[in-house]
Amino acid sequence: MRIHILGICGTFMGGLAMLARSLGHEVTGSDANVYPPMSTLLEKQGIDLIQGYDASQLDPQPDLVIIGNAMTRGNPCVEAVLEKNIPYMSGPQWLHDFVLRDRWVLAVAGTHGKTTTAGMATWILEACGYKPGFVIGGVPGNFEVSARLGESDFFVIEADEYDCAFFDKRSKFVHYCPRTLILNNLEFDHADIFDDLKAIQKQFHHLVRIVPGQGRIIYPENDINLKQTMAMGCWSEQELVGEQGHWQAKKLTTDASEWEVWLDGEKVGEVKWGLVGEHNMHNGLMAIAAARHVGVVPADAANALGSFINARRRLELRGEANGVTVYDDFAHHPTAILATLAALRGKVGGTARIIAVLEPRSNTMKMGLCKDDLAPSLGRADEVFLLQPPHIPWQVAEVAEACVQPAHWSGDVDALADMVVKTAQSGDHILVMSNGGFGGIHQKLLDGLAKKAQAEEE
């Protein structure tokens, strides 16, 4: 079968392209911006890429077109597909129909930690000999790709609540039919497609409804939004994580780089790993609980996490210059910002200076729905720098004024980088947070710090 994918360079759609190729299909695709690293990964798999959406790419006609959720009516290829009656479907539907239908699916859903937790679950299964398939929103550090078919019945998927396509406004995860479901947490997000928290809870309950009776749902006992969702009706086994739940994690070090796994009042494993932060400890415990459902002994799962490498952009060290360390993180919601800063504070200690540099880039952020929570979420930083995005209905200056620590802002990435470089001193830790590229600010900071060091020597 010849399959053409519209919007192929996104992580999810690129992952589907790799799976389709592994199944023996001829695969082509197009995107508005054909860019690495995804373009490089796809070309290595023998997938031809086309820049832009000129309708001529559909001649000769493919057997099937998979349409990404960024595609809208008016797109030349979308219009040609509809006009010529070319068979089409969304990515999540294709994934179910051609890959997941006969697999034991372990799905990881929630507002935060999906990529990390899915990567952990995948690595546990891999390290314990299960050879799972997976589709994950970032490339897990222990693997070279974001998706593969695997060699067993088990398949791990990052289960996103975003919509499927212009013709299917349900959340992607309703197509995945998991037998093991992790619900990490639930907060209001994706304000561009959801009106309120109840609208998201409704979609999460659709997901809960399709887990089999002998399937298992694992979730934190202290998450009120998930409790409300589960109270709408659950027909599957449940395991709770937390102080009053079945599972607990107990820190052995302040930065959570070592911790114990407890199940029903008994210690069943111990994790010593390269990650830090209570949020990662929580993610790891969820992954261990999910792996147990498919047959992995918790002690073995805990040992496997000792060699886990996180996906890029999760408190990732980008470099050091002039005694200043620069980190990058994907955090783009107040809860994630708070957790990431707490993790870094635990890592570097209470006296080291942390400089937080934030780009409010997600749709929810741009709409201003989180702005009142931003200043409190930045509380563990010693100094704050904010980028003012263009054309948004609020000013980051309001957040800067609400911060208890010194806070600064600029509408220009270069100017912001210069401000940070001037402020930074040897021994400081700069944490850059954005769900985008932030105008290449990481390298600008490292270059600026190196120049500053050179000038000081002269």
Describe the residue ranges of each PLM region.
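Acidic-glycine-rich active-site phosphate/pyrophosphate-binding loop
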Residues: 251-267
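Generic beta-sheet signal
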Residues: 30, 52, 91, 135, ...
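ATP-dependent carboxylate-amine ligase
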Residues: 1-34, 38, 43-49, 61, ...
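C-terminal accessory "lid"/substrate-recognition subdomains
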Residues: 260, 279-280
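Phosphate-binding loop of NTP-binding sites
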Residues: 19-23, 43, 57-60, 69, ...
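Short, polar loop motifs at secondary-structure junctions
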Residues: 32-35, 53-55, 71-73, 221-225, ...
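Beta-strand->loop->alpha-helix junctions that form or flank phosphate-binding loops
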Residues: 50-53, 91-96, 134-138, 233-254, ...
